[in-house]
Amino acid sequence: MAFTAFLLLLSSIAAGFLLLLRRTRYRRMGLPPGSLGLPLIGETFQLIGAYKTENPEPFIDERVARYGSVFMTHLFGEPTIFSADPETNRFVLQNEGKLFECSYPASICNLLGKHSLLLMKGSLHKRMHSLTMSFANSSIIKDHLMLDIDRLVRFNLDSWSSRVLLMEEAKKITFELTVKQLMSFDPGEWSESLRKEYLLVIEGFFSLPLPLFSTTYRKAIQARRKVAEALTVVVMKRREEEEEGAERKKDMLAALLAADDGFSDEEIVDFLVALLVAGYETTSTIMTLAVKFLTETPLALAQLKEEHEKIRAMKSDSYSLEWSDYKSMPFTQCVVNETLRVANIIGGVFRRAMTDVEIKGYKIPKGWKVFSSFRAVHLDPNHFKDARTFNPWRWQSNSVTTGPSNVFTPFGGGPRLCPGYELARVALSVFLHRLVTGFSWVPAEQDKLVFFPTTRTQKRYPIFVKRRDFAT
């Protein structure tokens, strides 16, 4: 018994000594202060545990209070520099491809495919990013997509019964919109079948990338294979149609097929897979949380209704929204901004240092990961007054923030700025217009937000809806 106790004491002393040596070595290297946590595991479990709750902030708050806004930690198997500092985040984003490169978990890389926009680098990424933006800019939305967005929103809302799972309905809308934009398909059995496979793919993003040990990942890989097979059929059929002289459609697939140096079917499929994820998951979550936050803030909901009822009063019974209507929704844009700030659908981005990098007096070693946390900045009271309160009126002020001008980054920044940011704003604005002018609603159950593996409500936000008398 005494010998066992002695061994435990000796082991504790040895572990403490090794920890002290490690801290001393890192201090001499000029690394930011922090803790690497337990061997191999690091602080991953603490992070996941916090983000599976409605209030994950303590994980960041405690470390910022102790170490400062840039600190060292160990996440998902790798030493990581965590930045809750807007200037550091901007530096990381702007130096994409120079000092830093994108770096994501193996599960995400495998499920998206090696030719996805997220994983492209250098000149190819620049070219494909520009191509993607050309199909989602203001001019394209105004001239081509606005009517499609409005039509698809109305099509889905017309099918609503008394009780709906809002997050599921929002996912249908955004998926159908993305499929239409990319491949010119209207809603139907094919798109709904594809969407259900996508649900499984997304569930596997933050799973252990070992099919033998992770059922979630295994199902995700199988679903990804089915998605790729379905998209390959579409690509091959479109190639045949164009070779036979069919009129070229004005969508992303047509642009990819017409590219000067040509893309293989596999490259096009990977590209489409990633764009479907990007346009589907994030925008649908923003829609759901905008409604949740508005429901919990009656004054904001009342002002939003007033703005949209003025637009509706100028229309005929059966009307379509136009670009000019979107541009006359100032308070709606305040709601959109505040939803993006509070919800933080994209909580941050991982990058990897391509060389030794010095910033703010600290050294980031080559090969180390950096996590630029948008969430930490957006919810920092040093940058936004009452930062953790949903307050869309703050965006009516000419001086929204109390800190530097680069603190609001819901769509990232630098060369990897989200190419669909304007399309997401328009889709949410149109959805809110049709919802508040066509329905009243109340929550069917209490529902909570969680933030891992993605931002979502636990129960998919069930609501009871009632059609308003003048709805068309």
Swiss-Prot record:
It catalyses: (22S)-22-hydroxycampesterol + reduced [NADPH--hemoprotein reductase] + O2 = (22S)-22-hydroxycampest-4-en-3-one + oxidized [NADPH--hemoprotein reductase] + 2 H2O + H(+); 6-deoxoteasterone + reduced [NADPH--hemoprotein reductase] + O2 = 3-dehydro-6-deoxoteasterone + oxidized [NADPH--hemoprotein reductase] + 2 H2O + H(+); 6-deoxycathasterone + reduced [NADPH--hemoprotein reductase] + O2 = (22S,24R)-22-hydroxy-5alpha-ergostan-3-one + oxidized [NADPH--hemoprotein reductase] + 2 H2O + H(+); (22R,23R)-22,23-dihydroxycampesterol + reduced [NADPH--hemoprotein reductase] + O2 = (22R,23R)-22,23-dihydroxycampest-4-en-3-one + oxidized [NADPH--hemoprotein reductase] + 2 H2O + H(+). GO terms for biological process: anther wall tapetum cell differentiation; brassinosteroid biosynthetic process; brassinosteroid homeostasis; pollen exine formation; positive regulation of flower development; response to UV-B. It is a single-pass membrane protein. Heme binds at C418. Its main location: membrane. It is an enzyme of class 1 (oxidoreductase). One of its GO terms (cellular component) is membrane. GO terms for molecular function: heme binding; iron ion binding; monooxygenase activity; oxidoreductase activity, acting on paired donors, with incorporation or reduction of molecular oxygen. The keyword Electron transport does not apply. It is found in: Membrane. It holds the Pfam family p450. Keywords: Heme, Iron, Membrane, Metal-binding, Monooxygenase, Oxidoreductase, Transmembrane, Transmembrane helix. Pathway: Plant hormone biosynthesis; brassinosteroid biosynthesis. Its EC number is 1.14.19.79. Disruption phenotype: Dwarf plants containing severely reduced levels of castasterone (CS) and brassinolide (BL) and of their precursor molecules. The chain crosses the membrane at residues 1-21. Its cofactor is heme. Belongs to the cytochrome P450 family. Catalyzes C3-oxidation steps in brassinosteroids biosynthesis. Converts (22S)-22-hydroxycampesterol (22-OHCR) to (22S,24R)-22-hydroxyergost-4-en-3-one (22-hydroxy-campesta-4-en-3-one, 22-OH-4-en-3-one), 6-deoxocathasterone (6-deoxoCT) to (22S,24R)-22-hydroxy-5alpha-ergostan-3-one (22-hydroxy-campesta-3-one, 22-OH-3-one), (22R,23R)-22,23-dihydroxycampesterol (22,23-diOHCR) to (22R,23R)-22,23-dihydroxy-campest-4-en-3-one (22,23-diOH-4-en-3-one), and 6-deoxoteasterone (6-deoxoTE) to 3-dehydro-6-deoxoteasterone (6-deoxo3DT, 6-deoxo-3-DHT). This is 3beta,22alpha-dihydroxysteroid 3-dehydrogenase.
